[in-house]
UniProtKB/Swiss-Prot annotation:
Protein name (database record): Disintegrin mojastin-2
UniProt source species: Crotalus scutulatus scutulatus (Mojave rattlesnake)
Matching SMART domains: DISIN
InterPro entries linked to this entry: Disintegrin_CS (IPR018358), Disintegrin_dom (IPR001762), Disintegrin_dom_sf (IPR036436)
Keyword Disulfide bond: yes
Family: Belongs to the venom metalloproteinase (M12B) family. P-II subfamily. P-IIa sub-subfamily.
Locus of motif Cell attachment site: 51-53
Primary residence: secreted
Keywords noted in UniProt: Cell adhesion impairing toxin, Disulfide bond, Hemostasis impairing toxin, Platelet aggregation inhibiting toxin, Secreted, Toxin
Presence of keyword Secreted: yes
Domain Disintegrin: 1-73
Domain of life of the native organism: Eukaryota
Lineage: Eukaryota, Metazoa, Chordata, Craniata, Vertebrata
Coiled-coil ranges per UniProt: none
Location of this chain's protein in the cell: Secreted
Length: 73
């Protein structure tokens, strides 16, 4: 939602302050296929394996999202 950096619905998330819905100090992310232990996963790490004629989708190192590369193998 607007103004939220993370989903504050779960107080158990160590990356997100449930009271403010903001990332905790030092955290880059709180969830996502390219987020691990509150940090972005390094560039080139497979976040979604190849399927059919499509290549692997990989993390960018700049975001917690796993972008679709849109490339055929």
């Amino acid at each position: 939602e607007a103004g939220e950096e993370c989903d504050c619905g779960s107080p158990a998330n160590p990356c997100c302050d449930a009271a403010t819905c903001k990332l905790r100090p030092g955290a880059q992310c709180a969830d996502g296929l390219c987020c691990d232990q509150c940090r972005f996963i390094k560039k080139g790490t497979v976040c979604r394996p190849a399927r059919g004629d499509w290549n692997d989708d990989t993390c960018t190192g700049q975001s917690a999202d796993c972008p679709r590369n849109g490339l055929y193998g």
